[in-house]
A protein has these predicted regions:
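Low-complexity intrinsically disordered segments
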Residues: 3, 92-110
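Phosphoinositide-binding peripheral membrane targeting modules
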Residues: 26-43, 47-100
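Anionic N-terminal interaction surfaces
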Residues: 1-45, 108
């Protein structure tokens, strides 16, 4: 299996139900969306059970790749806050069978 290292940049907070139709089928009945972030095309959804990454591809945006990372499969993480001259903060997570996934949040994002 090839090692994956996806990187989602330019994330900013959105309403919890923003784009719900795009990922609702991946949310379980006893699962709650806690945080929602969106870049120009991609999304990061944080639930009480997993991280859900949506990578929108292609010119029309019809092609989407969904990556689900259950918390039970995470093996490590790293956080870097935005500094005086930095425009973003970073969160890196490592999971079983995945090298790392990196998220870059715009400065001022909660």
């Amino acid at each position: 299996m090839p090692e994956l290292s996806p990187k989602i940049v330019g994330l900013m907070s959105t309403k919890l139900d923003d784009g719900l139709g795009m990922f609702e089928f991946l949310i379980g009945s006893n699962e709650e969306v806690l945080l929602s972030y969106k870049s120009v095309r991609d999304r990061l959804i944080v639930t009480n059970k997993k991280l859900l990454i949506i990578d929108v591809q292609g010119v029309t945006g019809r092609k989407k790749e969904y990556m689900v990372l259950p918390y039970s499969k995470l093996t490590g993480f790293s956080c870097e806050s935005a500094g005086t001259f930095d425009m973003d903060a970073e969160l890196k997570v490592w999971a079983s069978a995945i090298n790392q996934v990196e998220f870059q949040f715009l400065k001022g994002t909660d």
